[in-house]
Design a protein with these regions (language model features):
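N-terminal glycine-rich flavin-associated loop
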Residues: 11, 34-66, 88-133
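N-terminal accessory segments
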Residues: 1-33, 58-66
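Short glycine-aspartate micro-motif
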Residues: 85
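Short glycine-biased active-site loop of nucleotidyltransferases that positions the nucleotide triphosphate
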Residues: 33-35, 75-80
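Short acidic, glycine/serine/threonine-rich loops at helix termini
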Residues: 77-82, 117-119
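Conserved PLP cofactor-binding pocket of PLP-dependent enzymes
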Residues: 69
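A glycine-rich phosphate-binding loop feature that marks nucleotide/adenosyl-phosphate handling sites
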Residues: 25, 75-77, 134-135
Length: 135
């Protein structure tokens, strides 16, 4: 428990975003859409790229794994694990750059497929991977 508290305190000093190491948050993030349930060390909801870098640096300095997480819709357990979960879906969910002529887009990691395709649709484009979930 003391190690978890020290890790949470170090993350709170390092990031501007949310740091959640409470039992309820850990319970909510222990599952995805699969049958697996593994309690995370805690959760960081980064506000920006600097928060992501800071969280990874704190984790590395403390020997903790980091697991990026989107919507938690994995059907095979990729988004659960005994790690610090980085949930970018709240603040880092925008289209950053789009070039219609060259047909490319740069997005933040929390943007979901349906939102990307809604952005691209007026330009007659679609990002076509067929994933199990897209919202």
């Amino acid at each position: 428990m003391q190690v978890r508290d020290e890790l949470a305190a170090a993350l709170q000093r390092a990031v501007k975003g949310e740091v959640r190491f409470d039992a309820v948050s850990r319970m909510l993030y222990r599952t995805d859409a699969s049958i697996y349930a593994i309690e995370p060390l805690g959760l960081v909801v980064p506000r920006d790229e600097d928060d992501v870098a800071a969280a990874i640096a704190v984790a590395a300095a403390n020997g903790a794994a980091v697991l990026p997480r989107g919507g938690g819709t994995s059907l095979a357990g990729q988004s659960v694990g005994a790690a610090i979960h980085l949930d970018c879906s709240k603040y880092m969910n925008r289209v950053l750059e789009f070039n219609a002529e060259e047909r490319w887009v740069r997005v933040q990691p929390g943007l979901v497929l349906d939102e990307l395709n809604a952005y691209l649709q007026p330009h007659g484009l679609v990002f076509a991977p067929d994933v199990s979930t897209s919202s």
